[in-house]
From Swiss-Prot:
Family, as annotated: Belongs to the CcmF/CycK/Ccl1/NrfE/CcsA family.
Compartments reported by the entry: Cell inner membrane
Biological role stated in the UniProt entry: Required for the biogenesis of c-type cytochromes. Possible subunit of a heme lyase.
Keywords: Cell inner membrane, Cell membrane, Cytochrome c-type biogenesis, Membrane, Transmembrane, Transmembrane helix
Name this polypeptide is given: Cytochrome c-type biogenesis protein CcmF
Topology of this chain in the membrane: Multi-pass membrane protein
Gene Ontology BP annotations: cytochrome complex assembly
Length: 660
């Protein structure tokens, strides 16, 4: 028991030791890479082991403090309570700023560890530089953690008898899965950044670095997309207003690096396969990681008031801003000073290179538009004190047409060839796709019963993407036959097809749920009912229940259609007793083609309640499409050629180690 009293101090010591190892990892291998000293470069390996092990130990210490209700630790006292269920005790470890930053540092250490383990066949000088850059990033976050955000600070000598409890919004499975997935994506872009900076330091921007960094970038992009999808799903059912995206600044902060990351993985493919867009690809790698740091600044600086933002103080914001400026300024300085790279490879207008460049431009313009809409109100407020809100009308008006254009380019890009595509051949490929898309869109519109132009256009674009993929599959298997040819297609190819289908499915969900949702607010007493979109909702009243750390008024709503009961929903109004916070828990009947969503408002006396009812068609397709896209990315990253062909690529690049 006595030894347990020192667990927080052990955790703090491990963070400091991890910082020491990060310094060794950042400095020694980089110094060794300059003259080609193998011994110094090899020290990156034990340094990354030490950093990751000590961060894992520190995270374990903080977890132990939560699980044992150690309220002498300020972070535990502020974000836990003895009545909190054990699974929320565990997720509370990263439920606020300090713990989430420790999780960020741990995941960064994990990415570094993974790169060093799975990249052993790289030239030693390249690997040393990559690990050194990742060590520098770790130094920044660990200094931020230790100096301004120590999760092990004590509340001595006055130890509270109980904690202040975890924010009721976070007492949900969403906290268990959403932040780790999001951070895996955020931090994962540091790998692409590290490879890009290592290539700049080596003075050689060839196709090799693109091949080495591409699978890591795809994995990071997939995790970030899955994290964003889970966050949207969490907000939908937890916040009680029935929405899944509000263009909140913190939502935008996660979406921007995903958009630039999407451009990056396509640009890496061009650089790897054709040796073009080399400088542009490096710039995208820098931008993707810089945007993740911007996201950290927006969430943790206190400049935003958002349901997603951590309450913070200006000191933390200044630290992150300095770190962001250091990373962006330093990397752009290296980029500008790098030798000009001229591609010796040409390509024509109708080529995959051109279409992927168009893909990149659309995605970067979309990200820039979101960046402008997110930062402009903050800059205006800082300079003049004027308050301005940039909301959904701005973002929807600009973003939706860009995404429509992207889906057009996406389908054509799958069918065109590298370097040059005969126009006659391309027309022959696209004509049946276009005709089939129009036919499918009309049939789908008739079956759906809505010829709204937005809905019809979305059906057309989704069919366009789907049929282009099918046409390409038939084209690639035509020599061997479909049954014999399908097994020869690579995981990377299938991952690309699945990800594109996921985008189409998500687009259908977005438009159909937005255009055709029905909503109604009404005062209902027990036994009263309402009708909405062909459904009959009968309110049977609410009963009082006691939870582990809350009290609840749980309603019962029966749903009838065509005289048959199809669902019983139980919306709740919860009072979390420790913080005296009132929360809404929606009652949802999820279906493949629609969600029935009921939320309780305020009690109105005599057993009556304000009741909000939504009927949301195809809303689940949004998250299914997002998860499908992420799965496609992970499948592509598992392609066998990244493991088998890496040896030949390394042999091609071995001259790098001797020349620089």
């Amino acid at each position: 028991m006595t030894s347990a009293l020192f667990i927080p101090e052990l955790g703090q010591l491990r963070m400091i030791l991890a910082l020491c190892f990060a310094v060794v990892q950042a400095v020694v291998p980089l110094l060794g890479a300059w003259p080609g000293d193998r011994l110094w470069m090899s020290l990156a390996q034990p340094a990354r082991w030490g950093q990751f092990a000590f961060l894992l130990f520190a995270f374990g210490c903080l977890t132990y403090a939560f699980m044992t209700d150690d309220f002498s630790v300020a972070y535990v006292a502020n974000n836990s309570n003895s009545a909190l269920p054990w699974y929320y005790l565990f997720s509370a470890v990263w439920g606020a700023h300090e713990g989430s930053l420790l999780l960020w540092a741990l995941i960064l250490g994990g990415w570094t560890f993974a790169v060093s383990v799975f990249s052993r066949q790289l030239p030693q000088v390249m690997l040393a530089r990559v690990l050194a850059v990742m060590g520098m990033i770790s130094i920044g976050f660990l200094l931020f953690l230790i100096m301004t955000s120590n999760p092990f600070s004590r509340m001595l000598p006055q130890i509270p008898a109980d904690g202040h409890d975890l924010n009721p919004l976070l007492q949900d499975i969403g906290l268990i899965v959403h932040p780790p997935m999001l951070y895996m994506g955020y931090v994962g872009f540091s790998v692409a950044f590290a490879f890009a900076i290592a290539a700049l330091l080596g003075g050689r921007l060839d196709a090799a670095w693109a091949r080495w960094s591409r699978p890591w970038t795809i994995v990071a992009w997939a995790f970030l997309g899955i994290g964003i999808t889970l966050g949207s799903w969490w907000a939908y059912y937890e916040l009680g207003w029935g929405g899944w995206w509000f263009w909140d600044p913190v939502e935008n902060a996660s979406f921007m690096p995903w958009l630039v990351g999407t451009a990056l993985i396509h640009s890496l493919a061009v650089t790897e396969k054709r040796g073009v867009f080399k400088s542009w690809t490096v710039l995208l790698a820098i931008a993707a990681f810089s945007l993740t740091l911007l996201a950290a600044f927006l969430v943790r600086s206190g400049v935003l008031t958002s349901v997603h933002a951590f309450a913070s103080d200006p000191e933390r914001g200044v630290f992150i801003l300095i770190f962001l400026l250091f990373v962006v300024g330093g990397s752009l300085t290296l980029f500008v000073r790098a030798p000009v790279v001229k591609s010796q490879v040409g390509f024509n207008l109708w080529s995959r290179e051109t279409l992927l460049l168009g893909n990149n431009l659309v995605l970067v313009v979309a990200a820039s538009m979101i960046l402008l809409g997110t930062l402009y109100p903050l800059v205006l407020d800082a300079l003049s004190g004027a308050k301005l809100s940039v909301g959904p009308p701005y973002f929807n008006a600009l973003f939706i047409p860009l995404m429509g254009l992207l889906m057009v380019v996406m389908a054509v890009g799958v069918l065109v060839r590298w370097k040059d595509t005969p126009v006659k051949w391309l027309v022959g490929m696209l004509a049946p796709v276009l005709l089939g898309s129009v036919a499918l869109a009309v049939v789908a519109g008739i079956a759906y019963g809505d010829f709204n132009w937005a809905v019809l256009a979305t059906f057309l674009l989704a069919a366009w993407v789907l049929l282009a993929g099918v046409r390409d599959i038939f084209d690639k298997t035509r020599h061997k036959g479909l049954l014999k040819g399908l097994p020869t297609l690579t995981r990377s190819y299938w991952g690309m097809q699945i990800a594109h289908i996921g985008i189409a499915v998500c687009a259908l969900g977005v438009v159909l749920s937005s255009q055709n949702s029905a909503e109604r607010d009404l005062r209902l007493a027990p036994g009263e009912s309402m009708d909405l979109a062909g459904y009959h909702f009968i309110f049977e009243g609410a009963k009082h229940f006691e939870g582990p750390n809350f009290t609840s008024d749980k309603g019962t709503v029966r749903v009838v259609r065509n005289g048959k009961e199809i669902a019983v929903l139980h919306p709740e109004k919860r009072l979390y007793t420790v913080q005296s916070s009132m929360m809404t828990e929606a009652g949802i009947d999820a279906g493949f083609t629609r969600d029935l969503y009921v939320a309780l408002g305020e009690p109105l006396g005599d057993g009556a309640w304000a009741v909000r009812v939504h009927v949301k068609p195809f809303v689940r397709w949004i998250w299914f499409g997002g998860l499908l896209t992420g799965f496609g990315g992970l499948l592509a990253a598992l392609d066998r050629r990244y493991r088998v062909k890496v040896k030949s690529r390394v042999r091609e690049a071995l001259g790098m180690g001797a020349a620089v």
